[in-house]
Amino acid sequence: MSQANAATKASSDVFFNASLEDIDPEIFGAIRNELGRQRHEIELIASENIVSRAVLEAQGSILTNKYAEGYPGKRYYGGCQYVDVVEELAIERAKKLFGAEFANVQPNSGSQMNQAVFLALLQPGDTFMGLDLNSGGHLTHGSPVNMSGKWFNVVSYGVRKDDHLLDMDEVARLARENKPKLILAGGTAYSRIWDWKRFREIADEVGACLMVDMAHIAGLVAGGQHPSPVPHAHVCTTTTHKSLRGPRGGMILTNDADIAKKINSAVFPGLQGGPLMHVIAGKAVAFAEALKPEFKLYAKNVVDNARALAEELKSHGLDIVSGGTDNHLMLVDLRPKNATGKRAEAALGRANITCNKNGIPFDPEKPFVASGVRLGTPAGTTRGFGVAEFKEIGSLIAEVLDGLKVANSDEGNAAVEQAVKEKVIALTGRFPMYGYQG
């Protein structure tokens, strides 16, 4: 073997066999530190969850090497016979999980899945209705700073001021007055049951298409803990993470063959090129997990834990927007503790409790300050936390907020936060995750 060939072989051996730790210790160190954070902190961000080891393996597989523009059986590249199997499994499992006739599993994110529906069903300048961001909607539901708010005429509906529940009379009135081409139901910070049947009745009355974004509650729908929108909506979108417990990505479901054709064309070639086959593999694995009987118990536990957390927080003098929760999340109004969302998020973070500041309906504060925090139970439930643990977590949150009220500063109350942090580490230590060192 020549010297040049020997050097090439040695380089190839390193390329295919050296570990991440050997090749890039900086990235390895950041990942190791993030694993430590996830292991030792209580994750209460409602849009986050923890995937299984099997999903991690699928998403970190050699499928990342493969381009597969198009759809199974109709690719623009050769060598797709095995990734076709992967995508077909993901599609069939998604259809079975949600009782849908058609599924597109290629969207790379929640924003892109919603953009694909708009591309398929709307023209620039068309009118659509969506839940106002301040009432619990999403940026892609018509926010002025988002493409959805820039390209279309958006009519927003909201919640009532007295009880923070959806005002369906207002939805009907706005629909009759504005004759939207599409009505979008669903949100990111609404803790009550959605009346899909009523939304469909309103849509039919004005000749609109009903789109449901069930990104936050898809796992609860799959687990039988929230009514399914699939029988009522013309088209449904959902992310595949959050309560569904899969990799980060999106999916579109429909029972309408004509809409399915438009959706497929909108996703590819309209919006995306080659799909992320390693992510689609992770989606397929997560769907298989969600089809198992134990996932129904998981979904029930998520809701039971959320209700327990909400009641515990109320017992400590905090207000829960709409008075409680029917799903996996809640908005906590911090004004009884004279706190802002910004201060509370930082103080809880120092105590190893992770959440996000969030505006509440009719919030007097700016979005980056906010009067509330949003809390969710999917990740903690995945770790094995039950009602007892979430009651303890509620008490720990109140302890931090009471300390913050006494300190009345951005620096918080170091003594209280350290004491709570030690309790959090003790709690999380009883519920280990993954077998890696961290």
UniProtKB/Swiss-Prot annotation:
* Subcellular localization(s) per the UniProt record: Cytoplasm
Gene Ontology process terms (BP): glycine biosynthetic process from serine; tetrahydrofolate interconversion
Which UniProt keywords are given for this protein, alphabetically ordered?
A: Amino-acid biosynthesis, Cytoplasm, One-carbon metabolism, Pyridoxal phosphate, Transferase
Enzyme class per UniProt = transferase
What the entry lists under InterPro entries is as follows:
PyrdxlP-dep_Trfase, PyrdxlP-dep_Trfase_major, PyrdxlP-dep_Trfase_small, Ser_HO-MeTrfase, Ser_HO-MeTrfase-like, Ser_HO-MeTrfase_PLP_BS, SHMT-like_dom
Q: Which residues bind (6S)-5,6,7,8-tetrahydrofolate?
A: L133, G137, H138, L139
Q: What's one Pfam family the UniProt record gives for this protein?
A: SHMT
What catalytic activity is recorded? (6R)-5,10-methylene-5,6,7,8-tetrahydrofolate + glycine + H2O = (6S)-5,6,7,8-tetrahydrofolate + L-serine
Q: Which domain of life is it from?
A: Bacteria
Site feature: Plays an important role in substrate specificity: H241
Protein EC: 2.1.2.1
Pathway-wise, it operates in: One-carbon metabolism; tetrahydrofolate interconversion; Amino-acid biosynthesis; glycine biosynthesis; glycine from L-serine: step 1/1
Q: What CDD domains has UniProt attached to this entry? A: SHMT
Quaternary context: Homodimer.
Q: What family, per the record? A: Belongs to the SHMT family.
The record's annotation in NCBIfam families points to: PRK00011.1
What is the purpose of this protein? Catalyzes the reversible interconversion of serine and glycine with tetrahydrofolate (THF) serving as the one-carbon carrier. This reaction serves as the major source of one-carbon groups required for the biosynthesis of purines, thymidylate, methionine, and other important biomolecules. Also exhibits THF-independent aldolase activity toward beta-hydroxyamino acids, producing glycine and aldehydes, via a retro-aldol mechanism.
User: Can you name this protein?
Assistant: Serine hydroxymethyltransferase
Q: Which species is listed as the source?
A: Brucella melitensis biotype 1 (strain ATCC 23456 / CCUG 17765 / NCTC 10094 / 16M)
Gene this chain is encoded by: glyA
